[in-house]
Each structure stands twice: as structure tokens, then as C-alpha cells.
């Protein structure tokens, strides 16, 4: 996208990249749409990328999470498996997606956080009630994420373009002709 926010692209993707299995998929799709990505990781997970900006944050509990939230803005896309990060991103008006492809929304985030809390509580309560961890990631999981992520990216891009067109239609251009200002509304269609 050509529009800028303080010298930066208006829509950006921020990835909580510590042990994120879908970084390659995110980069492939984002590059297709020319959307910039920032991969955030701590000093224990050094990443390299030919497309994304890699931001290494000092080690510490939730250091990456807090940095990600401090730099994302309304309309950005956040990729994280952390429900707390997703909730904070939604609170800032950003879009959030899990590495499984599930979209976090204001309608489902509270229930997801409650389920996580109950599962954590059950794991701590007894060894007899041991809840297994997640299954090994499959190729189908990657396909599901790619489809869901691209759908989100297209939706965000469409909203951005619609907002840009609305703003341009409401602009008035002024021409100076023989020292007289003439107001002419912009009626051209934006592409």
C-alpha cells in the first residue's frame, strides 16, 4: 500500500514470532500484497528474514507481547497464539488471528480466554485429569491458516481502500484563477 503513517505503511502485520510455525506463510501472502511485516522475538529466538523487519526484544516475561502491543495501531493485523495479546490488539482496533487460522474477535475473545483459564486450572488440579497438549501441526493446518489469513488481509485491505475513497470523495480542491478562489468538489472516481 502506498499510504503512509509517519513514513510507514498504513496497514502493517505484526507477528508474535517466538516459536511461530506460520512465519513463512505470512511472508509469502503479505509479499503478494506488498504489506510490511514486523516479526517480534526475544533474544532466545533469533530470526532472519529477507522480507520482514525482525525486531529483537530483550528477554523477559511478556516483553515481546508488550512491545508488539505498543507498536501496533488500529487497522493493523496481529498474529499471535496468545489470547491476552489478541485481546489487547482488539482493544486498540487491530485485527488478530491465531496460528490455527481462527480469527479473534470482540465476540469470541472473552470465551476463549475463559476456556484457556479453565484448562490451565484443570491441568494444575490433578495428574489424573491430565489434558494433552496440542496435536502436531499438519499440512492441512497450514492450508487452513493460509486461507484464513489471506481472507483477513483482503478484508482489511478492502476496508482501507473504501475508507481512502470516502476521504477522497469528501475532499474539495481549490483552484486560483485570476486571483479568485473557486471551490470544485472532487467527483472523480478513485482507483
What are these regions (language model features)?
Residues 182-190:
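Short, intrinsically disordered C-terminal tails of secreted or membrane-associated proteins
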Residues 163, 174-178, 186:
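Intrinsic-disorder-associated, low-complexity terminal segments enriched in Asp/Asn/His/Tyr and depleted
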Residues 166:
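Short polybasic linear motifs
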Residues 2-163:
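Nuclease catalytic cores that cleave nucleic-acid phosphodiester bonds
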Amino acid at each position: 500500500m502506498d499510504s503512509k503513517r509517519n513514513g510507514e505503511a498504513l496497514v502493517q502485520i505484526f507477528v508474535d514470532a517466538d516459536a511461530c510455525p506460520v512465519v513463512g506463510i505470512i511472508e509469502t501472502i503479505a509479499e503478494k500484497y506488498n504489506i510490511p511485516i514486523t516479526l517480534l522475538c526475544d533474544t532466545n529466538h533469533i530470526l532472519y528474514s529477507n522480507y520482514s523487519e525482525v525486531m529483537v526484544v530483550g528477554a523477559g516475561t511478556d516483553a515481546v507481547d508488550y512491545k508488539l502491543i505498543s507498536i501496533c495501531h488500529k487497522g493493523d493485523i496481529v498474529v499471535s497464539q496468545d489470547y491476552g495479546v489478541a485481546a489487547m490488539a482488539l482493544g486498540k482496533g487491530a485485527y488478530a488471528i491465531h496460528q490455527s487460522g481462527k480469527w479473534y474477535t470482540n465476540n469470541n475473545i472473552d470465551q476463549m480466554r475463559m476456556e484457556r483459564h479453565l484448562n490451565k486450572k484443570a491441568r494444575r488440579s490433578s495428574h489424573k485429569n491430565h489434558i494433552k497438549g496440542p496435536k502436531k501441526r499438519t499440512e492441512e493446518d497450514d492450508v487452513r491458516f493460509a486461507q484464513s489469513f489471506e481472507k483477513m488481509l483482503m478484508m482489511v485491505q478492502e476496508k482501507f481502500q473504501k475508507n481512502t475513497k470516502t476521504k477522497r470523495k469528501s475532499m474539495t480542491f481549490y483552484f486560483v484563477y485570476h486571483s479568485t478562489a473557486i471551490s470544485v468538489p472532487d467527483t472523480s472516481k478513485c482507483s
